[in-house]
């Protein structure tokens, strides 16, 4: 079975990738390759950041690498925090500080104008081959206060109207069906099954 390296040290993300790909690949993460150089995500788009991570690591490791870049796009904030989602409140990255900043900026914005989406771009790179991309989105709105303890990042303030709960209140199984990353992963899996059959 071929190895697939997921370009992350985020255990939540890694679990999402493992769920979908363990039937096809031996899934590894950056924990298995501590020597890899840190890649600065300095792109202006999710596509640029995902490609940079996947292609740089694929060349370095000479292996199949999958990387993603994702973020929260809030309509009332003109699409912010966008590519800066992980570090929206500055360095070091801190989920609670990011949530606090978003809620502060949305103070006084009515519920119907708090629409937002999680957006994810996944890049799959292999040395000598063209990088494959997939996208996924999950629509929702930003709550006025955090609710729920599952998930990570902005999950406690991202309300999913179809389920009447925040991402942080949903079970892992439900989140894996709905999330932007799950949708991008499903799209990627369908693409690679067409390109690289078992």
Curated annotation (Swiss-Prot):
<dbReference type="GO" id="GO:0035870">
    <property type="term" value="F:dITP diphosphatase activity"/>
</dbReference>
<dbReference type="GO" id="GO:0000166">
    <property type="term" value="F:nucleotide binding"/>
</dbReference>
<feature type="active site" description="Proton acceptor">
    <location>
        <position position="69"/>
    </location>
</feature>
<keyword id="KW-0547">Nucleotide-binding</keyword>
<keyword id="KW-0479">Metal-binding</keyword>
<feature type="binding site">
    <location>
        <begin position="180"/>
        <end position="181"/>
    </location>
    <ligand>
        <name>substrate</name>
    </ligand>
</feature>
<comment type="similarity">
    <text>Belongs to the HAM1 NTPase family.</text>
</comment>
<dbReference type="InterPro" id="IPR020922">
    <property type="entry name" value="dITP/XTP_pyrophosphatase"/>
</dbReference>
<feature type="binding site">
    <location>
        <position position="175"/>
    </location>
    <ligand>
        <name>substrate</name>
    </ligand>
</feature>
<keyword id="KW-0378">Hydrolase</keyword>
<dbReference type="InterPro" id="IPR029001">
    <property type="entry name" value="ITPase-like_fam"/>
</dbReference>
<dbReference type="GO" id="GO:0005829">
    <property type="term" value="C:cytosol"/>
</dbReference>
<dbReference type="GO" id="GO:0009146">
    <property type="term" value="P:purine nucleoside triphosphate catabolic process"/>
</dbReference>
<feature type="binding site">
    <location>
        <position position="70"/>
    </location>
    <ligand>
        <name>substrate</name>
    </ligand>
</feature>
<dbReference type="GO" id="GO:0036220">
    <property type="term" value="F:ITP diphosphatase activity"/>
</dbReference>
<dbReference type="GO" id="GO:0046872">
    <property type="term" value="F:metal ion binding"/>
</dbReference>
<dbReference type="InterPro" id="IPR002637">
    <property type="entry name" value="RdgB/HAM1"/>
</dbReference>
<dbReference type="GO" id="GO:0036222">
    <property type="term" value="F:XTP diphosphatase activity"/>
</dbReference>
<feature type="binding site">
    <location>
        <position position="69"/>
    </location>
    <ligand>
        <name>Mg(2+)</name>
    </ligand>
</feature>
<comment type="subunit">
    <text>Homodimer.</text>
</comment>
<comment type="function">
    <text>Pyrophosphatase that catalyzes the hydrolysis of nucleoside triphosphates to their monophosphate derivatives, with a high preference for the non-canonical purine nucleotides XTP (xanthosine triphosphate), dITP (deoxyinosine triphosphate) and ITP. Seems to function as a house-cleaning enzyme that removes non-canonical purine nucleotides from the nucleotide pool, thus preventing their incorporation into DNA/RNA and avoiding chromosomal lesions.</text>
</comment>
<keyword id="KW-0546">Nucleotide metabolism</keyword>
<feature type="binding site">
    <location>
        <begin position="8"/>
        <end position="13"/>
    </location>
    <ligand>
        <name>substrate</name>
    </ligand>
</feature>
<keyword id="KW-0460">Magnesium</keyword>
<dbReference type="Pfam" id="PF01725">
    <property type="entry name" value="Ham1p_like"/>
</dbReference>
<dbReference type="GO" id="GO:0017111">
    <property type="term" value="F:ribonucleoside triphosphate phosphatase activity"/>
</dbReference>
<protein>
    <recommendedName>
        <fullName>dITP/XTP pyrophosphatase</fullName>
        <ecNumber>3.6.1.66</ecNumber>
    </recommendedName>
</protein>
<dbReference type="GO" id="GO:0009117">
    <property type="term" value="P:nucleotide metabolic process"/>
</dbReference>
<feature type="binding site">
    <location>
        <begin position="152"/>
        <end position="155"/>
    </location>
    <ligand>
        <name>substrate</name>
    </ligand>
</feature>
